[in-house]
């Protein structure tokens, strides 16, 4: 599946239009030499159903989508809602994408189905209302989520 078909779309009341800035960023990212270093590796992405996490997961999956097994990048998408993840990653479902269903705060207690080489922590509260109405709790959640992600990385010897 071509990333630009599904990722970079902005919905308006009138219609759906491509987000050309995001499409250009994705195309530029797919050319980065760094991606070659991830070939054959497993990357766990927290917040994989959010804008940043989802886009990163799709880029990694798209990069490794060819026939060459040495070029594959396995993505473990850490998500809270499996059904949402299935919808967002429809068309990317392959042996290179698995889910770890949990809240970021409990990630440290989970076990991945394979060795995790790298982790991208993209989970975050995105509701402005939460920041305004419950600032302490919101920051507490962010700190504890990051602590849990770091503990997972330590326990699993993530690079």
Predicted feature residues:
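A short, basic/flexible loop-to-alpha-helix module at the beginning of a structural domain
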Residues: 22-41
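Short, conserved SAM-binding/catalytic segment
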Residues: 83-97
């Amino acid at each position: 599946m071509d990333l630009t078909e599904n990722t970079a779309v902005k919905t308006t009341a009138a219609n759906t239009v491509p987000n050309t800035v995001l499409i250009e960023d994705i195309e530029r990212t797919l050319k980065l030499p760094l991606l070659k270093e991830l070939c054959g590796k497993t990357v766990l992405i927290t917040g994989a159903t959010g804008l940043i996490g989802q886009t990163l997961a799709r880029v990694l999956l798209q990069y490794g989508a060819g026939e060459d097994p040495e070029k594959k990048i396995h993505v473990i998408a850490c998500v809270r809602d499996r059904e949402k993840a299935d919808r967002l990653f429809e068309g990317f479902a392959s042996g290179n994408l698995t889910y770890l269903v949990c809240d970021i705060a409990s990630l440290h207690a989970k076990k991945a189905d394979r060795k995790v080489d790298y982790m991208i922590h993209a989970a975050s509260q995105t509701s402005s209302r939460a920041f305004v109405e419950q600032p302490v709790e919101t920051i507490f959640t962010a700190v504890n989520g990051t602590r849990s992600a770091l503990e997972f990385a330590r326990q699993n010897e993530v690079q």
